[in-house]
């Protein structure tokens, strides 16, 4: 999700400055935009978002001035790093992929006012919780069509994990309030 947000943000900012781009770069940016929109559609089954949502999330994450691209070299490098990390990820290493994307420095955190950071954390936790509830609902619907006992056990286990995670997130939200 983070890399999708970054790609959407960069593509949008680059296309706003179309007059500064040569034809080849413009075509690459358009290709990146098309690819990012395809990724948003793929992600939408887990986390329904629009192109605008992805850009807003990246702006919020970075707290950047959207009228300038002063940080373009840093953005480009981070985009390349995330892109390389995505190529190396596999579905079986979710913790590895989480650690790759959680590169928030203490300086970035200290620059966010405490109340605002708390609000951002609560908002994201509530969003995660609602998506987990949707996943739990989808898993409960999936149980109806299962004919294999191994798949049934796996779904029941995943529902339990999902419910326990929801409870932990709700408890965390209550402790932050």
Swiss-Prot record:
Keywords: Host nucleus, Host-virus interaction, Transport, Virion. It comes from the Viruses. GO terms for cellular component: host cell nucleus; virion component. A motif (Nuclear export signal) lies at residues 91-100, 117-127. It is found in: Virion; Host nucleus. Coiled coil: none annotated. Mediates the nuclear export of encapsidated genomic RNAs (ribonucleoproteins, RNPs). Acts as an adapter between viral RNPs complexes and the nuclear export machinery of the cell. Possesses no intrinsic RNA-binding activity, but includes a C-terminal M1-binding domain. This domain is believed to allow recognition of RNPs to which the M1 protein is bound. Binds M1 protein. May interact with human nucleoporins and exportin XPO1/CRM1. This is Nuclear export protein. It comes from Influenza C virus (strain C/Great lakes/1167/1954). The gene is NS.
């Amino acid at each position: 999700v983070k890399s999708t947000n970054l790609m959407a943000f960069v593509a949008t900012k680059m296309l706003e400055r179309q007059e500064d781009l040569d034809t080849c770069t413009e075509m690459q940016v358009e290709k990146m935009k098309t690819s990012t929109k395809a990724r948003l559609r793929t992600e939408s089954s887990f986390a329904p978002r629009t192109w605008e949502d992805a850009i807003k999330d990246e702006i919020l994450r970075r707290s950047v001035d959207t009228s300038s691209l002063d940080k373009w070299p840093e953005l480009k490098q981070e985009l390349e790093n995330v892109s390389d990390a995505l190529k190396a990820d596999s579905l079986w290493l979710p913790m590895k992929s989480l650690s790759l994307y959680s590169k928030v420095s203490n300086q970035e955190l200290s620059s966010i006012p405490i109340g605002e950071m708390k609000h951002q954390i609560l908002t994201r936790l509530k969003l995660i919780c609602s998506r987990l509830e949707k996943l739990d609902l989808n898993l409960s619907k999936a149980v109806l069509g299962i004919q294999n006992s191994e798949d049934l056990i796996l779904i029941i286990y995943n529902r339990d994990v999902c419910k326990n995670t929801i409870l932990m997130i709700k408890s965390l939200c209550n402790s932050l309030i």
